[in-house]
Amino acid sequence: MNNPSKAAQKKPKSNLIDGWEVVIGIEIHTQLATQSKIFSGSSTEFGQDPNTQASLVDLAMPGVLPVLNEEVVNLAIRFGLGIDAYIDQASVFARKNYFYPDSPKGYQISQMDNPIVGLGHIDIQLEDGTVKRIGVTRAHLEEDAGKSIHDQFEGQSGIDLNRAGTPLLEIVSEPDMRSVEEAVAYIKSIHTLVRWLGISDGNMAEGSFRADCNVSLRRPGDAFGTRCELKNLNSFRFIEQAINVEIERQMEILEWGGTIDQETRLFDPNKMETRSMRSKEEANDYRYFPDPDLLPVIIADEQIKAIKATMPELPAARRERFIAEFAITEYDAHVLTLSREMADFYEAVVAAAGGAAHGKIAANWVMGEFSGALNKAGLELADSPVSAEQLGGMIARIVDNTISGKIAKQVFGFMWDEGKSADTIIQEKSLKQETDTGAIEAIIKDVLAANEKMVEEYKSGKEKAFNGLVGQVMKASKGKANPAQVNELMKKLIG
């Protein structure tokens, strides 16, 4: 489903840093958008009082058994289809054995040998337009742990098990990234995809989307170096900062002849450093074995086919279509497909504006004035007081010369504040563009008569003088004169 564009054929720029090649692999944990947990009926709603959403299953009480939530399987399949991956139709759950206070069972139900999603890939686009394909090793289902609370009780720690059993999809990349830019672009691409497919809200502030970054250095052509894992990074800014800091740390050690210890490290954004958390475990440290309480997940061809039928057009395909159909730039197409909601909004604006021929002006308005108003007001797209149909209707009035681009900004401001259509605003505020040739000629003649010096300057070759005269006409018409007509008539009258 992800076909690399022509940009993928570009020769990549060198990513060497002082002769070292950076190697990065990413593990992403994204919370699946289900109403209940993966193995119990407890709610997954965020922000509730501690331990109010933990059932007997989540608490690991004796005699209770996990029951798989079918929806998490469907969402995992949906993701697999989105990255053109292999779907294992006989997937197995395993117990990952370790002890943490916020994990009541003493193990985590995860997947090891038979993950539900196998090899796949996703294409990322870098700032210079280069497209690179990143391999996805696997994506497997697992349950989240609870949360330890250390700052609410003096001398004691609390345990909140509301998150215990929350369904996660862990997405593991190949170590294909060779720079911080590529790593951030990959994580952003996965973030866009899981929201686009509706499998996760991707809310990083609430812990719905977290990244672990494995970083190592090597000389070009050498075997992979020893990697360190940067754990639980939950913002794109922190991800970029943490990887840069870790690269510098490892480079300094290696340049002085030292060796890198394989370990898990935490990033401290205040001190701008990473510090050791624990030695990095290998799979055999967790003593994985199939969970005896859960049967293998058998996925029928019909189930995959039914999910495939509900798949939306993917971001990469939509970008390519926008470029071809609406004649917009790669950059515009990239920005307009950062979310499915924005892409849908843009297409609705184009339709209301009169069709594909107006794709570029629609892109300019959506990305410019409209997005600026959203940001200034601190609103999400869904809360916009101006609908796609209203914005497209206003653009249609620019296209048919009812209003100029300058007047359109005034119209948009009134639409934003009053929630009315462009046509209503134009009529109520008397903002219709003046296109009557006689009326415009009369204004031009008055301006020329009052500015004889500027007329002579223009005749002597000073183009600025002409622009000044046009500005005077626009001012006299209160911005209503058609700029193209003003230019044409002005030149005709000056001779």
From Swiss-Prot:
GO terms for biological process: glutaminyl-tRNAGln biosynthesis via transamidation; translation. Pfam families: GatB_N, GatB_Yqey. This is Aspartyl/glutamyl-tRNA(Asn/Gln) amidotransferase subunit B. The keyword Amino-acid biosynthesis does not apply. Belongs to the GatB/GatE family. GatB subfamily. It catalyses: L-glutamyl-tRNA(Gln) + L-glutamine + ATP + H2O = L-glutaminyl-tRNA(Gln) + L-glutamate + ADP + phosphate + H(+); L-aspartyl-tRNA(Asn) + L-glutamine + ATP + H2O = L-asparaginyl-tRNA(Asn) + L-glutamate + ADP + phosphate + 2 H(+). Its EC number is 6.3.5.-. It comes from the Bacteria. SUPFAM superfamilies: GatB/YqeY motif, Glutamine synthetase/guanido kinase. Coiled coil: none annotated. Keywords: ATP-binding, Ligase, Nucleotide-binding, Protein biosynthesis. It is an enzyme of class 6 (ligase). InterPro entries: Asn/Gln-tRNA_amidoTrfase_suB/E, Asn/Gln-tRNA_Trfase_suB/E_cat, Asn/Gln_amidotransferase, Asn/Gln_tRNA_amidoTrase-B-like, GatB, GatB_C_1, GatB_Yqey_C_2, Gln-tRNA_amidoTrfase_suB_CS. Heterotrimer of A, B and C subunits. Allows the formation of correctly charged Asn-tRNA(Asn) or Gln-tRNA(Gln) through the transamidation of misacylated Asp-tRNA(Asn) or Glu-tRNA(Gln) in organisms which lack either or both of asparaginyl-tRNA or glutaminyl-tRNA synthetases. The reaction takes place in the presence of glutamine and ATP through an activated phospho-Asp-tRNA(Asn) or phospho-Glu-tRNA(Gln). GO terms for molecular function: asparaginyl-tRNA synthase (glutamine-hydrolyzing) activity; ATP binding; glutaminyl-tRNA synthase (glutamine-hydrolyzing) activity. HAMAP family: GatB (MF_00121).
